[in-house]
């Protein structure tokens, strides 16, 4: 990061390679449009490069870049009035460490696809702030503090969003015939 702050284009390109997937993933969730998300990801990195001097080196780079991506996506949604969408699942909401990717809930591929569809439908019914908090927690592996930084909300609010979303997802999946405890 020090070299990028010093103006090294090669160092910044390395940052882009490192964060391209999480930024694109976040933007696809926000917009529901991969082509638009790719454009917004490029815009995100241009903004990050232009604002490197504003980066607080005491913070995590991932949270800063994802915050820029979030703002860029929200701005685009406001301009285009796109409804936010999200996909994913996760682990314990009270765990302060970043989440690991969840293991498949069922070994049967057909059942796994059906569960994924049920989960996607359930996620689509959540409030956008809850969907985004869940996605940042379980897809991007951010801590609650980092989620708070990205969404500009207190850590306790980030915890609450994730907890309430998980509770609602469990209720919706159970209503659809899935046992959320398996």
Regions found by a protein language model. Name each.
Residues 83-112:
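Internal acidic/polar
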């Amino acid at each position: 990061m020090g070299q990028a702050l010093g103006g090294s284009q090669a160092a910044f390109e390395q940052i882009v390679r490192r964060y391209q997937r999480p930024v694109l993933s976040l933007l696809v969730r926000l917009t529901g449009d991969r082509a638009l998300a790719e454009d917004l990801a490029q815009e995100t990195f241009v903004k990050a490069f232009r604002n490197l001097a504003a980066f607080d080196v005491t913070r995590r780079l991932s949270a800063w870049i994802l915050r820029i991506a979030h703002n860029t996506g929200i701005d685009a949604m406001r301009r285009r009035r796109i409804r936010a969408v999200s996909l994913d699942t996760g682990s314990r909401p009270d765990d302060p460490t970043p989440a690991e990717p969840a293991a498949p809930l069922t070994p049967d591929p057909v059942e796994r696809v059906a569960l994924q569809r049920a989960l996607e439908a359930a996620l689509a019914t959540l409030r956008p702030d809850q969907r985004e908090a869940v996605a940042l927690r379980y897809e991007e592996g951010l801590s609650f503090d980092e989620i708070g930084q990205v969404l500009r909300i207190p850590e306790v609010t980030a915890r609450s969003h994730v907890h309430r979303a998980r509770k609602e997802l469990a209720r919706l999946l159970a209503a659809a015939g899935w046992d959320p405890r398996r």
